[in-house]
């Protein structure tokens, strides 16, 4: 209601100030309008031009809704209805590809039954279905009963130099060219019809003006100079309006009161969408000027005229199915980029050979922690900033084109620019929303991590206030000696031929290169016999036997000890050995050597790597192949995300194979076999993206879900439950290192998402 009242007050004030319109025609201000307007004038207001434009817009409004230079209550009511402030309305916009639904805010059409219809309402042969909101020519019709009224239509493109340059008219001296510019036009039924429309982009930074003049069929044009080309610059437009002011000022005050309205049959009716700068400069006002009430009153008719003419509305609902433009990629780039990306990612397994000597150093633990955080940032960033927005790209593009009739009016270039601006704004809107989601994810990570650090700090402080560490060591030694005595007595009671395989010792076996880093596999199996002892004895033994094996993901292979706080790691340890026993159902009546167990473990682990990791690589290759068919920037973004999360993953797999007893050559071979599935996935993704575009959109959505799962389920818990304090490292150092990795991953994906349309690479064969 506040908006309605403000518009009514503006309109009332404008009509009150300009009510004696016939007196304004006799003022000398109109004869002194500047012929040429300099674009860099001093800050201020050109009053003459402002008054001219004010009269121009008022004349258009009075021509549409007035009668005999006056605006009746009925006409005023129709004006309010047309600008949408007569009552509260609900607007429902339906996107119908068969026929356009009429918008409720165009309900004022039913009130124009008394208008004299011109050929503006005639449908073009190539557009059989036009919605009501496409035609606003009813606003320019003459009202029934106005047959005695004459309209003035000066020819703005012709100076009529054959006439005398000066003459005297009425009470004052006026230029003769103004008299020559004035023409009497017949009734609108026999007048010429030339539709002129000038449109420019709404953006203030980019101006695009296009003039279209289309003679209506069945009408003959008259009094229009065909040799004069349409002016498309602001300077010529302002110059024409200046000549219009001088020509209109020739009307004598002593003449009988006539209509001052302009006819629509000229090029003066400029239906242009004014932005702030355009609105001020067209009225002779500097953009640095401070507007007072009088100067603002000059702008009121233009504002109301803009609302009434709906010059700034662009209907995005398309009558026909939007044509998807050809993709800006080549099949050669897709194959080349995908092959290079998969090859680089697959060669990461060789990096593990170089890092083998560093696996037991603190530096490697810090490096791996940073890589895990970087993988979380790139995976989640690629999912929310790139994959999900691209999965909605086809839907957004299908609604980004204008209606055919609007395209015909504004031209193909304007339609292309408008569609491009709408598509870019929609895409960046999705990008900012994805960035907001990443912000929420990062905030919760910070909260949980900080709370964990605070809790660990308090626990450490309480622990230091208890018994000295020496007393604790003495007590632990007593418990271990007690357990050893119980274990030796139990071994004497068991027949050597009936001992389970869990009792196998590694004393007679040759030590492995990794025996110094962690207990042997046979020592791991001893944990499973703990059910034969009291619970307290089991609890005493677990910290020793579970050392370096209770950690999840790939850190359990890198010689890291675990903290007793994480009881779920103990449970994970039990499940791991239960799974191992199910896959090795050996008889308990036999003794197996370490080499036999190692060989069986290698075979099982090799298949796990080839099938499990190979399936993961296939999904990565599928995503990379489909992304490269979307464009080089899209493929680059997905490749970076896959690279960052495969880097720690491949290092972990390589370490698992080596610690299981494989040689370096065997580990490299099995990783290479799993990488072959990545090439197969890449080829599948390229074929799908090239021949079935709609399917590639679903691949993007599926890949986004996979990336989010890997980041949030596999890697974030690894970041939150690190064992830095067990190695004498600062937990806060790990915290800041992980934050740096996450933010770096977010930043990489954000930069690629924003500037991906500028990443262009072409190959000509």
Swiss-Prot record:
Gene for this chain: Slc39a6
SUBUNIT field: Interacts with SLC39A10; which triggers cells to undergo EMT and mitosis. Found in a complex with SLC39A6, SLC39A10 and with the 'Ser-727' phosphorylated form of STAT3 throughout mitosis. Found in a complex with SLC39A6, SLC39A10 and with NCAM1; this complex controls NCAM1 phosphorylation and integration into focal adhesion complexes during epithelial-to-mesenchymal transition (EMT). Found in a complex with SLC39A6, SLC39A10 and with GSK3B that controls NCAM1 phosphorylation.
Protein name: Zinc transporter ZIP6
Keyword match Translocase: no
Phylogenetic classification of the source organism: Eukaryota, Metazoa, Chordata, Craniata, Vertebrata
Source taxon at top rank: Eukaryota
Annotated positions of the Phosphoserine modification: 481, 488
Function summary: Zinc-influx transporter which plays a role in zinc homeostasis and in the induction of epithelial-to-mesenchymal transition (EMT). When associated with SLC39A10, the heterodimer formed by SLC39A10 and SLC39A6 mediates cellular zinc uptake to trigger cells to undergo epithelial- to-mesenchymal transition (EMT). The SLC39A10-SLC39A6 heterodimer also controls NCAM1 phosphorylation and its integration into focal adhesion complexes during EMT.
Annotated keywords: Cell membrane, Cell projection, Coiled coil, Glycoprotein, Ion transport, Membrane, Phosphoprotein, Signal, Transmembrane, Transmembrane helix, Transport, Zinc, Zinc transport
A GO cellular component annotation in the UniProt record: membrane raft
Source organism per UniProt: Mus musculus (Mouse)
A family per Pfam: Zip
Range of residues in the leader sequence: 1-20
GO biological process, one term: T cell receptor signaling pathway
Membrane topology of the entry: Multi-pass membrane protein
């Amino acid at each position: 209601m506040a908006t309605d009242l403000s518009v009514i007050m503006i309109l009332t004030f404008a009509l009150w100030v300009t009510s004696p319109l016939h007196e304004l025609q006799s003022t000398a201000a109109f004869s002194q309008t500047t012929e040429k307007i300099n674009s860099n004038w001093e800050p201020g207001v050109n009053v003459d031009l402002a008054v001219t434009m004010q009269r121009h817009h008022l004349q258009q409004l009075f021509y549409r809704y007035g009668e005999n230079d006056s605006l009746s209550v009925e006409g005023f009511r129709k004006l309010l209805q047309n600008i949408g402030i007569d009552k509260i309305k609900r607007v429902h916009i339906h996107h119908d590809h068969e026929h356009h639904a009429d918008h409720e805010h165009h309900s004022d059409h039913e009130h124009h039954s008394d208008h004299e219809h011109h050929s503006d309402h005639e449908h073009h042969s190539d557009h059989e279905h036009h919605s009501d909101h496409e035609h606003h020519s009813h606003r320019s019709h003459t009202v029934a009963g106005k047959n005695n009224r004459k309209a003035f239509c000066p020819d703005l493109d012709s100076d009529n130099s054959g006439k005398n340059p000066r003459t005297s008219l009425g009470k004052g001296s006026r230029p003769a060219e103004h008299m020559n510019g004035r023409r009497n036009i017949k009734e609108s039924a026999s007048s010429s019809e030339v539709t002129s429309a000038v449109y420019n982009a709404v953006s203030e930074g980019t101006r695009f003006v296009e003039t279209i003049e289309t003679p209506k069929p069945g009408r003959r044009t008259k009094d229009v100079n065909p040799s004069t080309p349409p002016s498309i610059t602001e300077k010529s437009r302002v110059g024409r309006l200046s000549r219009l002011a001088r020509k209109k000022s020739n009307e004598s005050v002593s003449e009988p009161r006539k209509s001052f309205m302009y006819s629509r049959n000229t090029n003066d009716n400029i239906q242009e969408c004014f932005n702030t700068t355009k609105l001020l400069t067209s009225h002779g006002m500097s953009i640095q000027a401070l507007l007072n009430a009088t100067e603002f009153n000059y702008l009121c008719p233009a504002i109301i005229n803009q609302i009434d003419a709906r010059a700034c509305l662009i209907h995005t609902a398309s009558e026909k199915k939007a044509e998807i433009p050809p993709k800006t990629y080549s099949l050669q780039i897709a194959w080349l980029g995908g092959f290079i990306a998969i090859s680089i990612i697959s060669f990461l397994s060789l990096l593990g050979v170089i890092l083998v000597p560093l696996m037991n150093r603190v530096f490697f633990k810090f490096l791996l922690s940073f890589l895990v955080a970087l993988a979380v940032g790139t995976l989640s960033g690629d999912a929310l900033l790139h994959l999900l927005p691209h999965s909605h790209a086809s839907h957004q593009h299908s609604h980004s084109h204008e209606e055919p009739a609007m395209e015909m009016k504004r031209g193909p270039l304007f339609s292309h620019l408008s569609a491009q601006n709408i598509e870019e704004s929609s895409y960046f809107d999705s990008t900012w929303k994805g960035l907001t989601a990443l912000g929420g994810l990062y905030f919760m990570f910070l909260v949980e991590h900080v709370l964990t650090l605070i809790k660990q700090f308090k626990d450490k402080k309480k622990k230091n206030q208890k018994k000295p560490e020496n007393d604790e060591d003495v007590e632990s030694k007593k418990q271990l000696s007690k357990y050893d005595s119980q274990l030796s007595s139990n071994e004497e009671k068991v027949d050597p031929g009936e001992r389970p395989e869990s009792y196998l010792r590694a004393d007679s076996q040759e030590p492995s290169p990794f025996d110094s880093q962690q207990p042997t596999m046979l020592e791991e199996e001893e944990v499973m016999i703990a059910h034969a002892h009291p619970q307290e004895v089991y609890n005493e033994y677990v910290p020793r036997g579970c050392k370096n094996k209770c950690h999840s993901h790939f850190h359990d292979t890198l010689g890291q000890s675990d903290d007793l706080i994480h009881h779920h790691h103990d449970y994970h340890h039990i499940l791991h050995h239960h799974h191992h026993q199910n896959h090795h159902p050996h008889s308990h009546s036999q003794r197996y050597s370490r080499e036999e167990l190692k060989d069986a473990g290698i075979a099982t682990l090799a298949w796990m790597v080839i099938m499990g990791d190979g399936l993961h690589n296939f999904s990565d290759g599928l995503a990379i192949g489909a992304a490269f068919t979307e464009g080089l920037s899209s493929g680059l973004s997905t490749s970076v995300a896959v690279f960052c999360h495969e880097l720690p993953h491949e290092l972990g797999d390589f370490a698992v194979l080596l610690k299981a007893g494989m040689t370096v050559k065997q580990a490299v071979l099995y990783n290479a076999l799993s990488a072959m599935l990545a090439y197969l996935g890449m080829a599948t993704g390229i074929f799908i993206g090239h021949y079935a575009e709609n399917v590639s959109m679903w691949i993007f959505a599926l890949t986004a879900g996979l990336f989010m799962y890997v980041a949030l389920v596999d890697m974030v818990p690894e970041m939150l439950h690190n064992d830095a304090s067990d190695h004498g490292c600062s937990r806060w150092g790990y915290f800041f290192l992980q934050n740096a990795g996450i933010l770096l991953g977010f930043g990489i994906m954000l930069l690629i998402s924003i500037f991906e349309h500028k990443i262009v690479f072409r190959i000509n064969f």
